[in-house]
């Protein structure tokens, strides 16, 4: 692994999400994993049978992650005349689920995000108040 100094004058970001990494400098391995199940409703209601989660109903949480094949036969050579990484500024809106913002060298980076987002939106007619006749 390359060994260098990372110097950043300014880092500005609004959000660092679940299982995300902000790393300055060299690292051997970064491994991020997150599983998210979210329900969004237009009306705030809660039914008595909610709150339990059955992973068997959602195969996305049970499937094995697809991993890339390992590098084979790739040879490379680097010559760093200045052994430092200089960055004036980094401005990021957000680093999302299982992502990385990294300034430096890394031997291995893995990220796995599984999201199931259910939106229950009612039609505009059903949201309007009932008219009494």
From Swiss-Prot:
A Pfam family it matches: GerPE
Induction: Expression is sigma K-dependent and negatively regulated by GerE.
Tree of life domain: Bacteria
Name the UniProt record assigns to this protein: Probable spore germination protein GerPE
Record key words, sorted: Germination, Sporulation
GO aspect biological process, one term: sporulation resulting in formation of a cellular spore
Database matches in InterPro entries: Spore_germ_GerPE (IPR024496)
Its biological purpose: Required for the formation of functionally normal spores. Could be involved in the establishment of normal spore coat structure and/or permeability, which allows the access of germinants to their receptor.
Lineage start: Bacteria, Bacillati, Bacillota, Bacilli, Bacillales
């Amino acid at each position: 692994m390359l060994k260098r100094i990372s110097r950043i004058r300014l880092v500005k970001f609004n959000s660092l999400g679940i299982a995300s990494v902000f790393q300055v400098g060299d690292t051997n391995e970064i491994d991020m994993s997150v599983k998210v199940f979210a329900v969004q409703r237009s009306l705030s209601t809660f039914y008595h049978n909610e709150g339990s989660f059955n992973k068997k109903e959602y195969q996305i949480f049970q499937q094995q992650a697809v991993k890339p094949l390992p590098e084979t036969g790739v040879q490379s050579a680097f010559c760093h005349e200045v052994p430092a990484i200089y960055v004036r500024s980094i401005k990021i809106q957000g680093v999302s689920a299982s992502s990385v913002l990294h300034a430096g060298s890394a031997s291995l980076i893995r990220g796995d995000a599984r999201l199931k987002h259910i939106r229950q939106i009612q039609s505009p007619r059903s949201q309007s108040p009932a008219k009494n006749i």
